[in-house]
From Swiss-Prot:
Signal peptide: none annotated. InterPro entries: Transactivation_prot_X. One of its GO terms (cellular component) is host cell nucleus. GO terms for biological process: DNA-templated transcription; symbiont-mediated activation of host NF-kappaB cascade; symbiont-mediated arrest of host cell cycle during G2/M transition; viral genome replication. Multifunctional protein that plays a role in silencing host antiviral defenses and promoting viral transcription. Does not seem to be essential for HBV infection. May be directly involved in development of cirrhosis and liver cancer (hepatocellular carcinoma). Most of cytosolic activities involve modulation of cytosolic calcium. The effect on apoptosis is controversial depending on the cell types in which the studies have been conducted. May induce apoptosis by localizing in mitochondria and causing loss of mitochondrial membrane potential. The lineage of its organism: Viruses, Riboviria, Pararnavirae, Artverviricota, Revtraviricetes. Pfam families: X. This is Protein X.
């Protein structure tokens, strides 16, 4: 069974906040800048890197108290479908890192909540999680699938 996550975009800081459902009372959200290059060293990642969450294909920095280096996971199937009539998620996120106009924060948040995470939770697709890096994360992956090229053309 797939782990359940809360997902919320914070437009004030332009970060994606993630945390396991049920952690509201004890944990802080896992968050990180969209597309920012990481300047922290891999040694800054805590030894408790969240293996208890049973997530596959996530880098250890995803569980760091400082948050992940960048937005970096989705369902393989969803990455290949359109987010709207004209653009796919990697291109949208890449444009956001460049400061270009894309879908609104509200629309992007709705996409994650209603599409990606719903399928992940209800269909148990965690084994299909892939890692897509916006920026230069230096962290190795936990039980990672074969590497993917984030900017592969559609």
């Amino acid at each position: 069974m797939a782990a359940r996550l809360c997902c919320q975009l914070d437009p004030a800081r332009d970060v994606l906040c993630l945390r396991p459902v049920g952690a509201e009372s004890r944990g802080r959200p896992v968050s990180g800048p969209l597309g920012s290059l990481s300047s922290s060293s891999p040694s800054a990642v805590p030894t408790d890197h969240g293996a208890h969450l049973s997530l596959r294909g996530l880098p250890v920095c995803a569980f760091s108290s400082a948050g992940p280096c960048a937005l970096r996971f989705t369902s393989a199937r969803r990455m290949e479908t359109t987010v709207n009539a004209h653009q796919i998620l990697p291109k949208i996120l890449h444009k956001r890192t460049l400061g270009l106009s894309t879908m609104s924060t509200t629309d992007l948040e709705a996409y994650f909540k209603d599409c990606l995470f719903k399928d992940w939770e209800e269909l148990g697709e965690e084994i299909r999680l892939k890692v897509f890096v916006l920026g230069g994360c230096r962290h190795k992956l936990v039980c990672a699938p074969a590497p993917c090229n984030f900017f592969t053309s559609a």
